Amino acid sequence: MTARGQATRRKLLNAAEMEFGNKGFHVSSVSSITGRAGVGQGTFYLYFRTKEEIFVTLVQEIGRNLRGKMQAALQAPGERSSRERAALQTFFDFSVSNRAHFRIVQEAQFVDEAVFRDYYEQIAADYAQSLEDNSEGQSAAERDPQVRAWGLLGMGHFVGLRRYLCTASDPSRQDFDSMMSLIKHQAPSQSAQGVAAPV
């Protein structure tokens, strides 16, 4: 694809992000996307076959970007617990900082369930791998990285969802700190064995 073609495709994706993020998938249309992008409808079909395809492309792109940021946090220098906290905060911040992305991902469940499932499974798999790599010294009950990963990410998702639904409220660092404090105090056996919880 030429540089000009890549720029046009990017313009369409940016327009679709705004349309889907503001109006939702079903209200948005190819014509509203191309109108926002400032291109003809025929141009759209040079890059995407359907409205569903550009939507799925956006969900996959959002997922790659988020996983990349979480991986960067997990691989950064420093203590394991600090890195895991930073990765979880990256996930939490996503839930509260970009309402359009959050809405698009949640709506994917009703547009393409397989893509929606893959989005969360890949995030959880990456986080679980980090937890598993650092599970030495934990009991069998504590060692299941999949349960821990989904549990921690689930907390981040729902605390972030609170901010998404409370439109009058701004994202708060205190929300994240309160959540991490809860995790810390619900995992005394890890500390007792010298293995820090991700706080």
Where would I find each of the regions flagged by the language model?
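C-terminal peripheral helix-coil segments that are non-catalytic and often amphipathic
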Residues: 93, 125-136, 155-199
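Basic, helix-initiating cap at the start of DNA-binding domains
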Residues: 1-23, 29-39, 53
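Amphipathic alpha-helical segments used for helix-helix packing
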Residues: 92-114, 158-165
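Hydrophobic alpha-helical connector segments
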Residues: 57, 71-97, 142, 148-152
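Short coil/turn segments at alpha/beta junctions that flank glycine-rich nucleotide-binding fingerprints
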Residues: 22-26, 77, 98
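Short hydrophobic/aromatic patch on the recognition helix
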Residues: 38-48
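Alpha-helical DNA-contacting segments of helix-turn-helix folds
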Residues: 48, 55-62, 116
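Amphipathic alpha-helical packing segments from all-alpha helical-bundle domains
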Residues: 64-67, 112-137, 146-151, 181
